[in-house]
From Swiss-Prot:
GO CC terms of this entry: membrane raft; plasma membrane
The species this protein was found in: Bacillus subtilis (strain 168)
Residue numbers bearing the Glutamate methyl ester (Gln) modification: Q371, Q595
Domain (Methyl-accepting transducer): residue spans on this chain: 375-611
Protein name (database record): Methyl-accepting chemotaxis protein McpB
Cache domain segment(s): 153-229
Lineage of source species: Bacteria, Bacillati, Bacillota, Bacilli, Bacillales
């Protein structure tokens, strides 16, 4: 874990992409797995408890139908019998015959009997009674007389005659002269109750309204109910409740039989729902692992396809920023990264051409500066010779003619030197102007590159906006698929309920059961298809998110390219400024050379005047001396300017040496 954290602390685009993609891959799957597990647990709970409730309700209906028919018979006898029916032996025999006939044709009826308010008792079939038996002292008689003509159903009890579980249904005679009652065996009902399955290990039980067991898997009949859940169950006529019994969580569904007041309940262990849901969890984990493996391979491929060109682009940009203009960027993709690589290559080619032209111009300027310096030196020496000749001429008239000729010869040499200086200065000026134009062209190339980089940036932002739109639409489709999936689940549940109802209907519902099964299969297929589509949409959303991260990183790299291009632009602006400054110096030097040429002509005219007018030699010599001194000062200025020009050319050469073009 510590190694992974240290790995994350080192920032890189590949790490960011890998972490982002893995998070986008795992988080939705975990959320979907958690929600699927919760949903499956809830649906299994609803399905199992729904089946249990249906079984309990069905058994409750069976109890009502079975005992209801017997209660109607008791009501019939209570309305047809009167006080006179118990008087006289013939009347009593007639009653017994009716009772016997009903017992013989109705299974589950143990006996029918009646008692009058005078103590008379009639029963069928005939059984031996205790001596002094008085029906008026029996609970069934007393409860019925207190009920005011309503049906009375006793709690179940074990019959002393045959050990069967029976209940008694009793009702007061219509004229109030006695009570008629019927003992009914409920062993068959109890056997049906034992067949009720609630989950795998759950069971059903019956309790009386007096909170005693009628039938239970682990308790005897008549045993009192105990536990916190008892009060909750008797608080409502029907419902569901959760409770803990013997440190085990259980869930119960129950209802109340209207005729008997019994509580009919089905209970199961909560662990069954958890065990049934484990298969969903296991399947989800398998899907998660498979998705991580497949997604990881795809993520590595995508990350490498993005970061590999970016690394080459960054490395080449650093090489170019260090002055190596021979570097080329090889990106063969046709996307924005490929276009950016082509733009960098075009910029490098433009820079190489520009630097090469500048170096040629600088070499020409340096050579011309050296020639100018040499010519200025020669001219300075000639001027010194003229000055010395004038001084010698002023010392004696005898040497005047020779000095004048020597001065005339030196002036001719000086004129030739000045013409050479003028031509060299003109060449340097042209080279400087050409360098300025080339620097301006380079600056335009850089500005065009900046414009193209900005265009790429706008294209990336527009593509990012389009991808975001696709992401929103994909999420809308996912929402619709979830609705379809919910409808399919509901259809599946309805089909299961229909199959249960068809199973209860027996042979008459077999066709409906087949149709329900087909509907359930279609619902399952629809749900599976919806899940597959939802999975595909989620993969599309993940790829869209990947594209968005790619656009952001490309946008950042484009911004870095803009910074590098701006730095290059500033360098060319500096070169352009220096070439302009050199052009200004050259123009100043041209003006100085022109002035020097004019002065040289004046000196030549003065020397000619010396040859023609000897009398004015003294004044002419002074003029020549003054002109010679001015000429010497001008030559020193030219020499200084040439030196400065040579230094500036050397500095410009040093600047261009930073760039490698071959």
């Amino acid at each position: 874990m510590k190694t992974f954290i240290n790995w994350l602390k080192k920032p890189s685009i590949s790490k960011k992409l890998i972490v982002s993609f893995i998070a986008i891959l795992i988080i939705p799957i975990l959320i979907l797995e958690f929600s699927s597990y919760r949903s499956a647990s809830g649906k299994l709970d609803q399905e199992i408890m729904g089946n249990a409730k249906n079984s309990v309700d069905t058994f409750n209906t069976t109890v009502t139908n079975d005992l209801g028919e017997k209660a109607k018979a008791v009501t019939f006898f209570s309305e047809s019998l009167k006080r006179s029916a118990f008087k006289g032996k013939s009347n009593q025999e007639e009653i017994k015959a009716k009772f016997s006939q009903y017992v013989s044709i109705n299974q589950g009826v143990a006996r029918i009997y009646g008692g009058a308010d005078n103590g008379t008792y009639v029963q069928a079939p005939k059984e031996k009674l205790p001596e002094g038996y008085d029906p008026r002292q029996r609970p069934w008689y007393q409860d019925a007389m207190k009920a005011g003509g309503e049906i009375v159903v006793t709690d179940p009890y074990v019959a002393a005659s045959d050990g069967s579980m029976v209940i008694t249904i009793a009702q007061e005679l219509k004229d109030g002269s006695g009570v008629v009652a019927m003992d009914i065996t409920i062993d068959k009902l109890l056997e049906q109750m034992k067949q009720i399955k609630v989950g795998k290990e759950g069971y059903a039980f019956i309790a009386t309204k007096n909170k005693t067991y009628v039938a239970h898997k682990n308790h005897k009949a008549g045993e009192k109910l105990s536990g916190d859940w008892v009060a909750k169950m008797y608080a409502n006529d029907s419902g569901e409740l959760q409770y803990t019994l013997n440190n085990e969580d259980k869930k119960m569904t129950y209802t109340t039989n209207e005729l008997t007041g019994w509580k009919i309940a089905g209970t199961m262990y909560m662990d069954e729902i958890k065990d049934a849901s484990k298969s969903v969890l296991t399947t989800g984990m398998i899907v998660l692992i498979a998705s991580i493996v497949a997604g990881g391979i795809l993520i590595l491929f995508i990350v490498r396809s993005i970061t590999k060109p970016l690394k080459r682009l960054v490395q080449s940009s650093k090489t170019i920023s260090r002055g190596d203009l021979t570097e080329t960027i090889e990106i063969h993709s046709k996307d924005e990264l490929g276009e950016l690589g082509e733009s960098f290559n075009e910029m490098g080619q433009s820079l190489r051409s520009l630097i090469s032209a500048i170096q040629d111009s600088v070499n020409n300027v340096a050579a011309s500066s050296e020639q100018l310096t040499a010519s200025a030196g020669q001219t300075s020496k000639a001027t010194e010779h003229i000055t010395m000749a004038i001084e010698q001429f002023s010392n004696g008239n005898e040497e005047q003619s020779e000095k004048v000729e020597s001065s005339s010869h030196q002036l001719n040499l000086m004129n030739e030197g000045l013409q050479q200086v003028s031509q060299t200065s003109s060449d340097i000026t042209k080279a400087s102007i050409q360098s300025t134009e080339i620097a301006g062209t380079g600056e335009k190339f850089v500005q065009q590159t900046v414009g193209q980089m900005n265009s790429i940036n706008q294209s990336v932002q527009q593509a990012e906006a389009v991808v975001k739109g696709l992401e929103g639409k994909s999420k809308d489709i996912t929402s619709i698929l979830r609705v379809i999936n919910g409808i399919a689940d509901q259809t599946n549940l309805l089909a299961l309920n229909a199959a249960i109802e068809a199973a209860r209907a027996g042979e008459s519902g077999r066709g409906f059961s087949v149709v329900a099964e087909e509907v359930r299969k279609l619902a399952v297929q629809s749900a599976d298809s919806a899940k597959e589509i939802e999975k595909l949409i989620q993969e599309i959303v993940a790829e869209i998110d990947t594209s968005l991260h790619m656009f952001k990183e490309v946008n950042q790299e484009v911004q870095s390219g803009l910074v590098v291009t701006d730095n290059t632009k500033e360098s060319f602006q500096s070169i352009f400024s220096m070439t302009n400054e050199i052009a200004g110096k050259l123009q100043t030097m041209n003006s100085t050379v022109e002035q020097l040429s004019d002065r040289s002509q004046h000196v030549s005219a003065a020397v000619s005047g010396i040859a023609d007018v000897s009398k004015e030699s003294s004044a002419s010599i002074q003029d020549i001396a003054a002109s010679a001194e001015e000429q010497l000062a001008s030559m020193e200025e030219i020499s200084s300017s040439a030196t400065t020009l040579a230094q500036m050319a050397e500095e410009l050469r040093d600047l261009t040496k930073q760039f490698k073009i071959e």
